[in-house]
Amino acid sequence: MELKGKRVLVVGLGESGLAMAKWLHRQGALVRVADSRDNPPNIDALQRVAPGAELVAGAFAEATFAGADFVALSPGVPKATPEIAALEIPLISEIELFADGVREQVPNSQIIAITGSNGKTTTTALTAHLLNGAGVPAIACGNISPSALDALMDAQDAGALPQVWVVELSSFQLETTHHLNAAAATVLNVSEDHLDRYEGSLANYAAAKSRVFQGKGVMVLNRDDDWSMANGRCGRKMVTFGLNAAPRGVDYGYADGAIWRGKDKLVAIDALKLSGLHNAANAMAALALCEAIGVDPLRLIEPLKGFSGLPHRVETVAEIGGVLYVDDSKGTNVGATLAAIEGMGRKVAIVLGGDGKGQDFSPLKPALEKHGRAVALIGRDAAAIGMALEGSGVPTRILGDMEAAVLWLAAQAQAGDCVLLSPACASLDMYRNYAHRAQAFIDAVEGLKS
């Protein structure tokens, strides 16, 4: 893609928008940045990284887009925004710029692309960890942060370009990505999330995810997820993983408490620091992705054993009186919370609630009928979740804040149980972000010790 002299409008001045402006400036493009906020973030940083870039802040107008050759759209700005939808010029993403930059400037490196409703950040971090542990230089970037273009520019500046880019991708990033051409890619799973952006359609959301398979690379598919498996295509190499026996010698599976490749046992899951069957699935996906680019899975087992996971993703906080307290604040949708409930292997007393993003909470009911000890509901959609759980037989109470929720659940829990924060909701109705929510949970658990 020839960028020199092109007039490019970057829409949105968050992390991704700033990275696009910086990259485009470096490539000799004429950069204008538009943000619908009157006082967007990163104004000073924009002038440092893209001197001379024009900034248009405030409500979009026809003049905002005048003269642009194409628009580089930040993932937080929907394509359906009326002023964007009316455009007749190309829309591209940061990831499109990144993939093009890698092809043109780092042609000897490969891209591994990872998306899914749940587990994509852990799988991205784990895949990069496995590759580096096996002596294959890799950088994790994208939705996981740093942004893909920031990672590329930083590696160029440091003269330390990796062999592999492991890129976490959201559906938002994929909407305007057209030529990703990853060497290997996966859709880990698809469950209800962000449906407010996709007209309430799970099929539209899944279609955005499936764009990760652009090109001819190896497809890594989840046998336990119909949406993932639906991406299978004739003429493409496909490897599957799932929480059952591997059907073919090239596939990954779970049986007898261990991860297998075909009929070869690789590692017992109790030898891993990662906990939960959902993380066994993430590990299988990571192994398959690494093998897809030519790394022998036997070289990956020791690094796999050493990976302890990421903060706020099924992370043990404490054990008090025989009860485990686990922070899964990153469980922001129903699918993630189901995975946590079913993967704990014990009864759960759970904190649910927040901004439900229009999800259907009814799938939680059978899981809690089987695994639930008690349910504490907080936040904006507490009542809606409570209605979805009616008749479950599990004690349920709406409470005013995290401290009250943890205190009540601690009183309901029995030795051997888990008090689990996995809210199935976004956090912004009560907290700055999911990490702030996690800290409230951790503080409440600490209060139990005193």
UniProtKB/Swiss-Prot annotation:
Binding of ATP, residues: 116-122
GO cellular component: cytoplasm
Pathway the protein contributes to: Cell wall biogenesis; peptidoglycan biosynthesis
Superkingdom field: Bacteria
Keyword terms, alphabetized: ATP-binding, Cell cycle, Cell division, Cell shape, Cell wall biogenesis/degradation, Cytoplasm, Ligase, Nucleotide-binding, Peptidoglycan synthesis
Enzyme category, top tier: ligase
GO molecular function terms attached to this record: ATP binding; UDP-N-acetylmuramoylalanine-D-glutamate ligase activity
EC number: 6.3.2.9
Gene3D superfamilies linked: Mur ligase, C-terminal domain, Mur-like, catalytic domain, NAD(P)-binding Rossmann-like Domain
Keyword Ligase: yes
Catalytic activity: UDP-N-acetyl-alpha-D-muramoyl-L-alanine + D-glutamate + ATP = UDP-N-acetyl-alpha-D-muramoyl-L-alanyl-D-glutamate + ADP + phosphate + H(+)
Localization of this protein: Cytoplasm
Gene Ontology terms: biological process: cell division; cell wall organization; peptidoglycan biosynthetic process; regulation of cell shape
Entry similarity comment: Belongs to the MurCDEF family.
HAMAP family tied to this protein: MurD
Annotated function: Cell wall formation. Catalyzes the addition of glutamate to the nucleotide precursor UDP-N-acetylmuramoyl-L-alanine (UMA).
Stated name of the protein: UDP-N-acetylmuramoylalanine--D-glutamate ligase
Organism: Dechloromonas aromatica (strain RCB)
Organism taxonomic ancestry: Bacteria, Pseudomonadati, Pseudomonadota, Betaproteobacteria, Rhodocyclales
